[in-house]
A protein has these predicted regions:
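Catalytic machinery of carbohydrate-active enzymes
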Residues: 1-235
Length: 235
């Protein structure tokens, strides 16, 4: 009975549908998109459990309907229970930590196991309202700073923490606060600087060239702002 039970279990494992858990910040979520697009070419029955939020899968022609917020009603009972679960980790991919591939390619290797290959750029599908909101923000900042060129600066990663007057990132995925201030001061001579940060940053202001730190909670609007801006610096 034992061998039969083994082969039965193995067969069930090979035919079971899959659930992929994606965690972390916006960069990781966006970087996973090309890998899932590739997976969809051969498997249309997987789901994505969005531990880091599903904002960047919204509006995608194929991934939106496969993506579930981790608070989705009856997620475990209706969607996960009968699936095999995977948590792809691009930072653990050999090609990535040996600097032979991008984060998107590392996701592709972890998810599709097809080795290193060329991928399309990840695309965020935004609606007209989001694009208009981003355009308005950019125009307001240009008017405020009297600058024609706009640079968006995202200095802190998802793992950064605000500790009093300091912003600390134990994983070293963020700029040091002193460097953030220095970069902002250098950039504002030539650009309208927009800082994308949930943490307060004190930068010595000049009356003629202020630095914008808009408190916008919607990351999709931020995506629109970044797309319309002339340059983006991020970590």
């Amino acid at each position: 009975n034992s061998p039969n039970k083994y082969f039965y279990t193995q067969e069930r494992t090979l035919t079971r549908k899959k659930a992929y858990f994606i965690n972390g910040g916006a960069g990781r979520v966006v970087a996973s998109i090309p890998a899932f697009e590739k997976l969809y070419e051969t498997d249309k029955d997987f789901i994505i459990v969005c531990e880091g939020g599903m904002d960047f899968y919204k509006g995608h022609p194929v991934l939106h309907e496969l993506a579930y917020d981790n608070w989705h009603k009856n997620l475990f009972k209706d969607y996960i229970k009968d699936r095999d679960c995977f948590s792809p980790e691009p930072y653990r991919v050999w090609e990535y930590y040996n600097q032979k591939c991008s984060l998107a390619q590392a996701f592709d290797i972890a998810i599709n196991n097809e080795g290193l290959r060329d991928l399309t750029d990840p695309t965020i599908h935004m609606n007209k309202q989001e694009m208009v909101q981003g355009f308005k923000v950019i125009e307001e900042i240009k008017a405020m700073t009297k600058k024609d060129k706009v640079v968006v600066f995202q200095p802190f990663g998802r793992t950064a923490e605000n500790m009093g007057d300091f912003v600390i990132d134990s994983t070293s995925r963020s700029f040091h606060l002193n460097d953030v201030i220095r970069i902002c001061k250098d950039l504002r001579d030539d650009y309208a600087v927009v800082v994308m940060s949930e943490f307060p940053i004190t930068i010595e202001e000049t009356p003629t060239v202020p630095i914008a730190i808009p408190q916008i909670s919607d990351v999709r609007v931020w995506s629109s702002i970044i797309q319309i801006a002339d340059h983006f610096i991020g970590c």
